């Protein structure tokens, strides 16, 4: 089935499969595309094509990820599946694949395992709002009581990490059975997708959020004034809108948008995702620089101290060869600029090894516009040594 036949009028969501190694995430991903393809809603993707995940580079980090897409009767989904546990950690922490919701796969034969817990924790840390559970391999469990026990364990685990373990859907089935076309199990995959449709909420679109654009470059147009260029991250820029310009420790500037330029044409507006030049009233070129943000007045404040969930690259990934200790001072590449900051490790953690992921506290030398969920890279001498995202603003 050709790509073009997808109905783009359906609301779009990004989801993914998470869970312990060998519990059937990739088999389930293949089963979903197969079952929906047979219902005329998707194109078929074989297990092998998903399992041989291509390498991607995101913020200087190599991650193996498979992307599949499919539709249900109500929605269009982009779905990510990662072959290895380390790929999941990197994917979730760096936000290479932003997820609006996740399908947690738990093998009924095993019950929740260490990575089950770790993926739920990561989901909580990186703000995946809702999780649907697929209890897999139930065809290999004869004992009905055991199934109930596993479901109860999973629900308790979700509740422990502040997900709605009591009300969230848990669907029992067999991904392999569905992939092989056994009707009983095909039905469970359809039931799963119905649960995903109903339980995972549509995210707020970037366009509907407050306006924010990180400044990439600044120049002067004779007779028109100062222009700041960049890619609009969220919201809409309209000619005539008042804006704040928030910078690296400097006092905030107030201005008005006098024009939005795109592909050398003057427009009335620009929206999230557009690369634009914004004309600013009463601002000198010397007052703005790369790394500042232009935003809706009062919507963003500069902060210098925050908690973050980070992944530190292994040596083989181009990261550090040695561990680092408390008060390590790298650069934090946020949006369009580097800012030096000091890392404080959690109590009881003496040092951080390449390949670790953990929660750290960061204090930047100068305050910059920050919000929860914002992603960044950690750099040292111009090379990326880690990546993460802000989980909590402290001050």
Curated annotation (Swiss-Prot):
Region ranges (G4): 136-139
GO CC list: cytosol
The enzyme's main class, written as a single word, is: hydrolase
Q: Where is this region: G1?
A: 19-26
Q: Which residues bind GTP?
A: 19-26, 81-85, 136-139
Q: Which InterPro entries does this entry report, sorted A to Z?
A: EF-Tu_GTP-bd (IPR041709), EF-Tu_GTPase (IPR050055), EFTu-like_2 (IPR004161), EFTU_2 (IPR033720), G_TR_CS (IPR031157), P-loop_NTPase (IPR027417), Small_GTP-bd (IPR005225), T_Tr_GTP-bd_dom (IPR000795)
Q: Which family does it belong to?
A: Belongs to the TRAFAC class translation factor GTPase superfamily. Classic translation factor GTPase family. EF-Tu/EF-1A subfamily.
Q: What is this protein called?
A: Elongation factor Tu
Species, as recorded: Cellulophaga lytica (Cytophaga lytica)
Q: What is the lineage of its organism?
A: Bacteria, Pseudomonadati, Bacteroidota, Flavobacteriia, Flavobacteriales
Name the gene for this chain. tuf
């Amino acid at each position: 089935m050709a790509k073009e036949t997808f109905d783009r009028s359906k609301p779009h969501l990004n989801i993914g499969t998470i869970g312990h190694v060998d519990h059937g995430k990739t088999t389930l991903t293949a089963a979903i595309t197969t079952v929906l393809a047979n219902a005329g809603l998707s194109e078929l993707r074989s297990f092998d094509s998903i399992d041989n995940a291509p390498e991607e580079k995101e913020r200087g980090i190599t991650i193996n990820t498979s992307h599949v897409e499919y539709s249900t009767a109500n929605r269009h989904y982009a779905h990510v599946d990662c072959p290895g546990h380390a790929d999941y950690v990197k994917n979730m922490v760096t936000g290479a694949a932003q997820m609006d919701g996740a399908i947690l796969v738990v093998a009924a034969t095993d019950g929740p395992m260490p990575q089950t817990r770790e993926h739920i924790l990561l989901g909580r840390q990186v703000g995946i709002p809702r999780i649907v559970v697929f209890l897999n391999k139930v065809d290999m469990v004869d004992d009905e009581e055991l199934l109930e026990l596993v479901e109860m364990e999973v629900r308790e685990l979700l509740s422990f990490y502040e997900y709605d373990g009591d009300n969230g859907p848990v669907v029992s089935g067999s991904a392999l059975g569905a992939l092989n076309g056994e009707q009983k199990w095909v039905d469970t995959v359809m039931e799963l997708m119905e649960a995903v449709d109903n339980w995972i909420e549509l995210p707020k679109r970037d366009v509907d959020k407050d306006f924010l654009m990180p400044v990439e470059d600044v120049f002067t147009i004779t007779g028109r004034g100062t222009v700041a260029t960049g890619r609009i991250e969220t919201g809409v820029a309209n000619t005539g809108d008042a804006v704040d310009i928030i910078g690296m420790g400097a006092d905030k500037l107030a201005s008005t948008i006098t024009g939005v330029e795109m592909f050398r044409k003057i427009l009335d507006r620009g929206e999230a995702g557009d690369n634009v030049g914004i004309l600013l009233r009463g601002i000198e070129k010397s007052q703005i620089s790369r790394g500042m943000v232009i935003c809706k007045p009062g919507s963003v404040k500069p902060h210098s101290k925050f908690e973050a969930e980070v992944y530190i690259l292994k040596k083989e990934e181009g990261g550090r060869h040695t561990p680092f200790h408390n008060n390590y001072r790298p650069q934090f590449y946020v949006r369009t600029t580097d800012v030096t900051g000091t890392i404080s490790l959690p109590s009881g953690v003496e040092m951080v090894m390449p390949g670790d992921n953990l929660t750290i506290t960061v204090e930047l030398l100068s305050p910059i516009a920050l919000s929860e969920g914002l992603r960044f890279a950690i750099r040292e001498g111009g090379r990326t040594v880690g990546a993460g995202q802000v989980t909590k603003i402290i001050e």
